[in-house]
Amino acid sequence: MAQHTVYFPDAFLTQMREAMPSTLSFDDFLAACQRPLRRSIRVNTLKTSVADFLQLTAPYGWTLTPIPWCEEGFWIERDSEDALPLGSTAEHLSGLFYIQEASSMLPVAALFADGNAPQRVMDVAAAPGSKTTQIAARMNNEGAILANEFSASRVKVLHANISRCGISNVALTHFDGRVFGAAVPEMFDAILLDAPCSGEGVVRKDPDALKNWSPESNQEIAATQRELIDSAFHALRPGGTLVYSTCTLNREENEAVCLWLKETYPDAVEFLPLGDLFPGANKALTEEGFLHVFPQIYDCEGFFVARLRKTQAIPVLPAPKYKVGNFPFSPVKDREAGQIRQAAASVGLNWDENLRLWQRDKELWLFPVGIEALIGKVRFSRLGIKLAETHNKGYRWQHEAVIALASPDNVNAFELTPQEAEEWYRGRDVYPQAAPVADDVLVTFQHQPIGLAKRIGSRLKNSYPRELVRDGKLFTGNA
């Protein structure tokens, strides 16, 4: 694999020499940092099984190497990367996999370790969505996830990835993560804080990541991280699990932040060792039981993961002073909900009791029941999935609902050819050789729902959202 030149400040190298365990070679660290990062993907088990995914992609000649800490994760090598980006493959467009760095799969593995099965989870810094979608898959779209993102520009990307992966149990918020301890005290069974950090572990992906690095900036970032972990710990219920992670390597932003929390709440914080998380985890284990992953250990990004348990309640913070405002939705009455459910089922859309119908004007939404306790406590950017818009002739079913709820075995499902599916993703109407009989057609490809079409004569009218339409070469070049 080709080398690339990484910029290392002298003070950073000094710091790394001091931080690195004696069992590791500093020369190996430098060599690993100069190697480009291995690409990796995670199979979306909400859409397919790992076995079915491997069978589907076998003709492409991809080399998939299992990632030890994530059963559905693989390092991927493929000859056609220049000809066809992974993001343009049919399997990616339909949400069968997520392009995710291997080490970033570690925090969610830690969150669900030892049979942990939380029902209400918060992802404090969620964009672009790799960990939120991984959490949703582990929860099998049950329960509820609050996915927060402080950066307004990244909320849209977060929603797009959640929608592509067919996720229905997520509520999105746009807050500074430091508000949650006061706003929603002891409301979550599990919390992931993948904290903003100095990014020292990402130099294999971005050789210039350390151009603005300084020891002073590490200290400033660590101060923010302490405030974030304190807030998250307040939002965690007693007995709940908190996973703290970063993609940086210095102790100040990693071990020291967790030790500060334990010093602050000595009777309420328990460190849960991660040495048995996967075979070989002990190679990165710290004396506290955390995983401090230097890039040469597993040939991945540098990363840090700690798992904590809240053993008892702590004093509640003063209530926040902001006003949430009136909630613009109201629950749909049972009789009407039954009619809506019946109409949705006729086009292949079905949902279980984890989701409840709500209405705003002519919009119909499905909210995860587990998030209802937070209504009135935080302001949501987006909640659940938009099911439909009502009009005089019935319902206009929404694309994100089709991706999340549709069964490909529905009587009105219509399987496209690869060429027809490409036309669909380009936003063009499709002219199949043998047109379907139904007027409302559930369009599928590779037996996966990819949209809903109106049949007009021999034409399938495209309803693929304009913002998702793709240009350039697509997947007929996969094989």
UniProtKB/Swiss-Prot annotation:
One of its GO terms (biological process) is rRNA base methylation. Its EC number is 2.1.1.178. It is found in: Cytoplasm. It holds the Pfam family YebU_pre-PUA_dom. The active site is at residue 247. PROSITE patterns: NOL1_NOP2_SUN, SAM_MT_RSMB_NOP. One of its GO terms (molecular function) is RNA binding. Specifically methylates the cytosine at position 1407 (m5C1407) of 16S rRNA. This is Ribosomal RNA small subunit methyltransferase F.
